[in-house]
UniProtKB/Swiss-Prot annotation:
This is Restriction of telomere capping protein 1. A zinc finger (RING-type) spans 1294-1336. May be involved in a process influencing telomere capping. GO terms for cellular component: cytosol; GATOR2 complex; vacuolar membrane. It comes from the Eukaryota. One of its GO terms (molecular function) is zinc ion binding. One of its GO terms (biological process) is positive regulation of TORC1 signaling. Belongs to the WD repeat RTC1 family. It comes from Saccharomyces cerevisiae (strain Lalvin EC1118 / Prise de mousse) (Baker's yeast). Residues 952-962, 1016-1028 have a biased composition (Basic and acidic residues). Keywords: Metal-binding, Phosphoprotein, Repeat, Vacuole, WD repeat, Zinc, Zinc-finger. Residues 630-644, 815-824 have a biased composition (Low complexity). The lineage of its organism: Eukaryota, Fungi, Dikarya, Ascomycota, Saccharomycotina. It holds the Pfam family WD40.
């Protein structure tokens, strides 16, 4: 068993039984006391005697078990074994030879607490040895202050019925009560050291102070004055020198406050001034020289702060710190000490005032979120420490910005660094943010700076006392705010503290005990902390935590002081002069202010502070009543003699002045920030990647945080993909505008046709969009998609150049398209349909753009952690989506061009003659015409000469063609019935007429036309499903005979011959088509045609002799494909035709499927990737694919997708990724993900009166039986959980309608009243009420 040194050396008298070593005394508990009424194995009694022979009684120190075994206060882990009690006798000198003895009964002697836990004290732990003074008094204590007389080691303690002067002796380390100013004829001392108080009569009236009493002592000439709250609205001033029973120690009473006083303070420079603040939010300043009467009801200066009640008010201190050097010493202090004061309020505001202009505050800081409780000035710098109910202690800079001290960075023992993140060269930031914040975890009621000079604010010590259950005083070094430097343990919670000097600190506690510590003898918290502590990081056991072995320090390196050559002592600016002549009231600050009120006018007497008419604090004096509109001052320069600091023989402070260097601070900070950001990112990436490689859990967490799982967004929220898409559009518009501007400045255009300009603008827009997409996704020139896009742009250029190079007569165009005038209404209908299709297409394109952006982001995330497999997967998905985007954008562009062409043709048609139209085409046929008319419409350049201006001879046949077209009846599409022969006859006549008219013209085809036709052929190959009709028309048209061949080339297979009319048996024009088998289809045999021949399809047909019988048979059998076979009658002679039609339809469907569903289809690809992810167990990739592509491509069944997402949510919850899980549920495309687990919850209701569980099974069975007997099912509506079967009483009713609460219930939080949702809604929303319907005070709803 380990005991303290004094206990081990103490002699134990005979007859007392020592504690056995094997005795388990841990059951006594920490903080329990070993003293008892009888002698036993675990009780000791220790008495210490002084040299005088009189026993110096050390009262029993009983500390309740206020703290648990392990204390986590303020983040500091302190085992109970290391929190060694400060109450021990180690401070006693060894030559006193203390001894211990035990007694059999309880007496007035004190019992000493001894640590008895076996092996509890670490041998390396330094015990507390700083407690040198301690005593217990009989009176209740509430406040403590020191006597500012260096000749008296005195303290002043006050309570409800006690105001005592205590003196402590450093020689015998004792504290004695010298005088009690409340109880007459009392020489009170500690219990057992002096005689007891004489018994007072029961009728003796005891003066009681208020519970918020405060006590302060004066300075300099008023160092014998003690100020204390005699009652809630008065301050009583006592004289320390009048301690006899004859003299009345009361000097005066100051009572002007209308409500209770919370705080007051003496001025350290002008010691005749005292300031007070209270619940009435007023600050009163009193001059003791003018208040010589026993009671004063008028203060010299009254300031209404226009804020909440004042909790604490303090003057700026004026310490005279000495600096010794080789040639002497000099003293210096703050030049503003006599004028500045500050107050803290219930609202949390900190106000700083200047006595020279009290009408307005200098600074107003929002110091705390709750009420501010205390404040204290720094001894020599313009800093204020504040404490509040929010558990924070904040340090604020309240000086002028021009004279602000440089902020020092907290490096915990290292030298200050200019580039540290806490450094701020602009002190204006102090107005909004504190320089330092210490989170104590409990309300801070008292705090005091150590009264020592410190050039660096962070080397200051701050003592803090709390209102909570922590029976201790914490001393913090501002250089290390998380771990206190000293923890001074007391018996009960501390009530106040005061620094006697730099090393000695006193406090009082709720146990009416006065304690004094020498902090130089106290161990630091770091010395008592265990260095080998290891614990688990979290409950799951993922990692360990240990303590860093580098202890650090509590100080910041200060600059060295440079000695000065002067030996003259610098006087303090607030030195008091004893006037020889004149009224003493006219001396000092108050006298100067009173003299400042001149008789001529009211102006501000301070030259550097112009008058400011500002709403806020108001000011009043005894000698002058100011107007309500403006509170200002006036004075003359002659009256400021006492206010001006006395600076005779003043010299510079013995500190080297700082060097001023001009720097571009924003640029320096920006460079530092960028460097640190890049370095930190690099380190973070390296550390994260290395840790994630070794930990699958960390990799999962990283991917869950970084990957994008959904492209679904809210309407008011735009994600990164939407923002990127908008930025792309904006960039495209900028590039387009720049291109147009450049084109206008460099070239001149002659636009004759508005429709052509529109087409050119559309082509330019498409070109810009495609080039921007190529640059955005970094496609090389040899990429497949880039090659296709560039080829498409080149084709559009050649088409635009060829169309711009040829010019033909507008009358020819009007004549060639006059046959489609009857389709105008069908065009309008089709345009409406096209708009809807275009809107759907735009939505699909937007979805693809979002998916491409997400795929790119996810690929970059996998690349950052060197997961190349998944990186390639997302790149593959992105490329596949880009293929789909390319196809959709090309189809949209082609549809836009077609619509523009229709618009141009319709406008040209309206400009011409209004021809009579025949029957309207069916809506399903669109703008279809006969074969010859389609050929003329699609290729008008094939029916004119090469010359730019047609001759008169050429115009005449065209006019005849125009007349013929007027008389020509528009032929509808043929149906697969007996009318097909008539359609073919009419088609033959029309073709012959066109052939004769064109033969006379003798037109030829140029090279450009053939090249353009070849380009059109490439476009037809991209859309093979539109080719059968056109192929039949071209093959049957005899117009091709008039087109000459420029070069002799071999025949080739056309697109139609290869894919649609392929037959293994070949085709002969004389063959009977109706006798062929179903599996044999039509085939044209051109054995000498090369498939790579760059000859137009029109030229290929021009070298072939197309007989009328062949065309007739082909038309009759291809009619079911062109027409609508749904309503065709079935005839016996058309069986062969129907079989051939069925065979062609199957082949056509097969070709469409092959082209529309290639092997690299996105749906196939994503399904394969999904199957691979499920087989390999890649959870993140599986869920990501389901989120993004399930609703688009139907990857798997809905139930499987929901189940996978639900398990993914459970994983997120397991690894505490609750925010990501919430986003997954928010943007999930499916509903009911969690199933029954997420929708259903069991809630148990208990009766408010009896506390039993409400089941109401008996009433339920009773009502069910009654409903079965009567057959009335409405009886079950009476059942509910708004009553209790156990106590037969109803629960709380609605506060408004007083009916039972059966359905949705609302609770008013401030008062707890309940009500129906509709009742509460009507009361607060409809009737705009703010109070509770039950009449509860306060605002219940805002």
């Amino acid at each position: 068993m380990s005991l303290s040194p004094h206990v081990e050396n103490a002699s134990i008298p005979k007859g007392s039984t020592p504690i056995p070593k094997n005795r388990n005394v841990s059951s006594i508990g920490k903080g329990e006391f070993l003293g008892s009424s009888s002698s036993n194995n675990s009780s000791f009694r220790m008495n210490h005697y002084s040299n005088s022979g009189q026993p110096s009684v050390l009262d029993s120190i009983r500390r309740p078990n206020l703290t648990p075994t392990f204390s986590y206060s303020n983040g500091v882990y302190m085992p109970e074994s290391h929190r060694t009690s400060s109450f021990n006798d180690s401070y006693l000198p060894y030559d006193k030879n203390p001894y211990a003895k035990t007694t059999g009964s309880m007496s007035n002697k004190s019992n000493m607490k001894i640590k008895t836990k076996k092996n509890a004290i670490n041998t390396n732990t330094r015990k507390s040895s700083g407690l040198i003074y301690t005593t217990k008094v009989d009176k209740e204590l509430s406040s403590i202050d020191k006597v500012n007389d260096p000749n008296i080691n005195g303290l002043v303690c006050a309570g409800k019925t006690h105001l005592g002067l205590y003196k402590f002796s450093p020689s015998d380390r004792s504290i004695k009560c010298v005088h009690d100013f409340i109880t007459p004829n009392s020489n009170t001392s500690t219990r057992g050291t002096t005689s007891l108080l004489p018994k007072l009569s029961k009728r003796t009236r005891q003066n009681k102070f208020s519970t918020i009493a405060d006590v302060k002592t004066g300075f300099n000439n008023y160092k014998n004055c003690i100020a204390v709250c005699n009652n809630s609205t008065a301050i009583s001033i006592y004289d320390l020198n009048k301690s006899s029973s004859i003299d009345n120690p009361l000097i005066t009473s100051l009572c002007e406050h209308t409500r209770s006083i919370n705080s007051f303070d003496f001025n350290m420079v002008e010691s005749n001034l005292i300031i007070s603040g209270g619940q009435d939010s007023c600050v009163k300043i009193w001059d003791l020289r003018s208040n010589k009467s026993k009671s004063s009801n008028r203060s010299d200066i009254s300031i209404n702060t226009a804020s909440d009640s004042i909790r604490d008010v303090k003057w700026m201190p004026g310490y005279n710190f000495a600096s010794k050097n080789d040639q002497g010493s000099s003293t210096y202090g703050n030049l503003k000490s006599g004028y500045k004061f500050a107050s803290i309020h219930d609202s949390g505001y900190l106000l700083k005032f200047d006595l020279r202009q009290p009408a307005q505050y200098e600074k107003k800081l929002n110091a705390h979120t709750g009420p501010g409780l205390c404040l204290n000035w720094h001894p020599n710098q313009e800093y204020i420490a504040t404490g509040g109910r929010d558990g924070k202690c904040c340090l604020w800079f309240v000086g002028d910005n021009a004279n602000a001290a440089e902020n020092t960075v907290l490096n915990y023992g290292n030298s200050p660094s200019l580039h540290a993140p806490n450094t701020s060269l602009n002190n204006s930031g102090s107005l909004a943010f504190p320089k330092l914040t210490i989170n104590t975890g409990y309300p801070v009621t008292k705090l005091k700076f150590k009264p020592a000079y410190s050039s660096n604010i962070y080397n200051s010590l701050l003592g803090i006392s709390s209102m909570g259950d922590e029976a201790e005083v914490r001393i913090y070094s501002l250089a290390r705010k998380y771990i206190p430097k000293h923890v001074l343990l007391s018996e009960t919670p501390s009530l106040g503290l005061v620094w006697w000097d730099e090393n000695l600190i006193f406090n009082i506690d709720k146990g009416t005990r006065i304690n004094g510590w020498d902090i130089n003898k106290e161990p630091t918290v770091l010395e008592n902390l265990s260095k080998n502590t290891t614990t688990w990081r979290d409950l799951d056991g993922n990692g360990l935590l240990s303590v860093d072995q580098e202890i650090g320090s509590y100080e910041v390196v200060e600059p060295e002081l440079q000695p000065t050559s002067s030996t003259t002592c610098k006087k303090h600016p607030g030195t008091i002069k004893n006037p020889k002549n004149g009224n003493p009231e006219n001396q000092g600050i108050i006298g100067g202010i009173k003299k400042g009120f001149s008789h001529t006018g009211l102006t501000s007497f301070t030259p550097e502070r112009p008058p400011t008419l500002k709403a806020g604090p108001t000011f009043s004096t005894k000698s002058l009543t100011l107007a309500s509109g403006a509170s200002s001052f006036n004075s003359s320069s002659a009256s400021l003699t006492s206010l001006t600091p006395q600076t005779e023989n003043r010299e510079e402070i013995a500190i080297e002045p700082p060097c001023i260097i001009t720097l571009d601070i924003p640029q320096i900070f920006n460079n530092i920030r960028l460097t640190k950001i890049a370095h930190s990112r690099k380190k973070n990436v390296i550390s994260e990647s290395s840790s994630m490689k070794n930990s699958p859990v960390e990799k999962f967490k990283y991917l869950a945080r970084q990957l994008k799982f959904s492209y679904i967004r809210e309407h008011n929220v735009s994600d990164s993909a939407d923002t990127a898409y908008k930025n792309d559009i904006e960039n495209i518009d900028v590039v387009k505008n720049a291109t147009e501007t450049h084109g206008d400045n460099t070239t001149t255009t002659n636009n004759n046709d508005d429709g052509d300009d529109d087409d050119d603008d559309d082509d330019d827009d498409d070109k810009i969009i495609e080039s921007h997409l190529l640059k955005k996704y970094n496609f090389p020139e040899n990429n497949t998609w880039a090659t296709l896009m560039n080829e498409k742009v080149n084709n559009k250029k050649s088409k635009r150049n060829s169309s711009s190079s040829r010019e033909f007569d507008e009358k020819d165009v009007r004549s060639s398209i006059s046959s489609i005038s009857a389709s105008r209404q069908s065009h309008d209908r089709s345009r409406k349909i096209d708009k809807n299709v275009e809107a759907e297409l735009q939505e699909k394109i937007q979805t693809l753009v979002d998916l491409i952006s997400i795929a790119t982001h996810n690929a970059s995330v996998y690349l950052s952690i060197d997961d190349l497999t998944n990186f390639k997967i997302w790149i593959l998905i992105r490329d596949s989506l880009l293929w789909d985007l390319k196809w959709m954008t090309s189809s949209q562009i082609s549809s836009d061009n077609a619509s523009n062409m229709d618009a141009n043709e319709s406008s040209d048609f309206e400009a011409g003659e209004n021809l009579k139209t025949g029957k309207e085409f069916p809506e399903e046929d669109g703008a279809g015409t006969s074969g010859a008319e389609s050929l003329v419409e699609e290729r008008p350049q094939a029916f004119r000469a090469n010359s730019d201006e047609p001759s008169d001879a050429e115009k005449k046949p065209v006019s005849k063609l125009k007349e013929q077209l007027k008389n020509t009846e528009i032929i509808p599409y043929a149906q697969p019935n007996e009318d097909s022969d008539e359609v073919l006859i009419k088609l033959k006549e029309l073709q012959n007429q066109r052939l004769e008219s064109r033969t006379k013209m003798g037109e030829t085809v140029s090279d450009d036309v053939i090249i353009e036709e070849d380009e059109h052929e490439h476009q037809e190959e991209e859309q093979p499903h539109d080719s059968p009709t056109k192929s039949a028309q071209f093959h049957a048209s005899p117009i091709a005979k008039s087109i000459p061949i420029l070069q002799k080339r071999e025949h080739r297979k056309s697109f139609i011959d290869t894919f649609m009319l392929h037959s293994p048996n070949g085709y002969n024009g004389d063959t009977d088509i109706g006798n062929e088998d179903d599996n044999i289809s039509l085939r044209f045999t051109y054995n000498s045609v090369s498939p790579r021949s760059k000859v137009s399809s029109l030229q290929s047909y021009a070298t072939t002799t197309s007989q009328l019988e062949t065309f007739k048979k082909l038309s009759s059998h291809t009619a079911p494909i062109i027409g609508s076979p749904r309503h065709a009658p079935s005839r016996p002679d058309s069986i062969g035709r129907e079989q051939l039609s069925s065979s062609l339809t199957k082949k056509l469907a097969k070709c469409k499927k092959i082209i529309a569903d290639p092997p690299w289809d996105t749906k196939k690809l994503i399904k394969q990737l999904y199957n691979q992810a499920t087989e390999t167990g890649n959870v993140v990739l599986t869920v990501n694919i389901l989120f993004l592509f399930q609703t688009i491509y139907q990857i798997t069944e809905i139930d499987i997708a929901k189940d996978a997402i639900a398990h993914f949510l459970l994983l997120l919850h397991r690894y505490e990724l609750f925010g990501i899980a919430a986003d997954v549920l928010k943007y999930c495309p499916f509903e009911d993900i969690m199933g029954s687990e997420g929708d259903q919850s069991s809630i148990r209701l208990f009766c408010e009166r009896c506390g039993e569980l409400i089941t109401n099974e008996s009433s339920k069975e009773k009502l069910r039986a009654e409903a079965q007997q009567t057959g009335n099912k409405k009886i079950m509506d009476k059942f509910g959980y708004w009553y209790c079967d156990s106590c037969k009483k109803k629960n709380t009713s609605c506060v408004l309608c007083e009916r039972p609460l059966k359905k949705l219930t609302m609770v008013i939080l401030p008062c707890g009243h309940e009500g129906h949702f509709q009742c509460i809604q009507e009361w607060f929303l409809d009737e705009n009420e703010q109070e509770c319907p039950g009449g509860c005070p306060g605002v219940a709803f805002i």
